[in-house]
């Protein structure tokens, strides 16, 4: 009986030590800050950051149009939330905001920590929901940052040092 009690106690203690995955994008961003605390470097440009402030000089970043947004860290979905959700019924009825509020499957996909990385805010905004592809432009839009956005083609080109994204998850 004593062994059974000890076993059950150990089992209970062990299962409580594992954290649940974040259920919302807001929760995921909080967890992501702790994940990147040991290596506070932006994903696309290699800029260092402290708190939510990007050190633009650390990577030679030059703002294209939005210096205030360029100076802050934002959490980028490598596979855009639009790709994950635009075919879902909730998106048809009110876009991302509706899906975040009403669709727990979308919320979990939006909160996937494997799909979130810290980036320069301006780059996040400029990339929007554009897919990745090869572009002929030389990387100069953002100073020394090797990220390129072609707004007419609705395409972004990631630096060659950044791994390609996995296919978008299928949400049912």
Give each language-model segment a name:
Residues 10-11, 36, 111:
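Sterically constrained small-residue positions within well-ordered secondary structures
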Residues 4-12:
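Sec-dependent N-terminal signal peptides
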Residues 61-74, 78-172:
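Domain-level detector of nuclease and nuclease-like folds
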Residues 20-72:
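Aromatic-lined ligand-binding clefts that engage carbohydrates, nucleic acids, or primary amines
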Residues 14-16:
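N-terminal signal peptide c-region/cleavage motif recognized by signal peptidases
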Residues 6, 19, 50, 83, ...:
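Residue-level marker of positions within ordered structural domains that often coincide
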């Amino acid at each position: 009986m004593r062994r059974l009690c000890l076993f059950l106690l150990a089992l209970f203690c062990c299962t409580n030590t594992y954290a649940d995955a974040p259920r919302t994008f807001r929760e995921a961003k909080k967890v992501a800050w702790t994940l990147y605390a040991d290596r506070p470097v932006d994903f696309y440009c290699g800029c260092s950051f402290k708190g939510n402030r990007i050190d633009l000089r650390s990577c030679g970043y030059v703002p294209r149009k939005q210096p205030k947004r360029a100076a802050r860290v934002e959490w980028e979905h490598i596979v855009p939330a639009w790709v994950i959700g635009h075919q879902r019924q909730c998106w048809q009825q009110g876009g991302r905001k509706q899906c975040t509020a009403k669709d727990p499957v979308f919320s979990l996909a939006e909160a996937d920590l494997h799909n979130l990385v810290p980036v320069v805010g301006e780059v996040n905004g400029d990339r929007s929901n554009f897919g990745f592809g090869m572009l002929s432009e030389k990387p100069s839009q953002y100073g020394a940052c090797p990220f390129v956005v072609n707004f007419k083609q609705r395409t972004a080109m990631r630096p060659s040092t950044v791994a390609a994204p996995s296919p978008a998850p299928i949400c049912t």
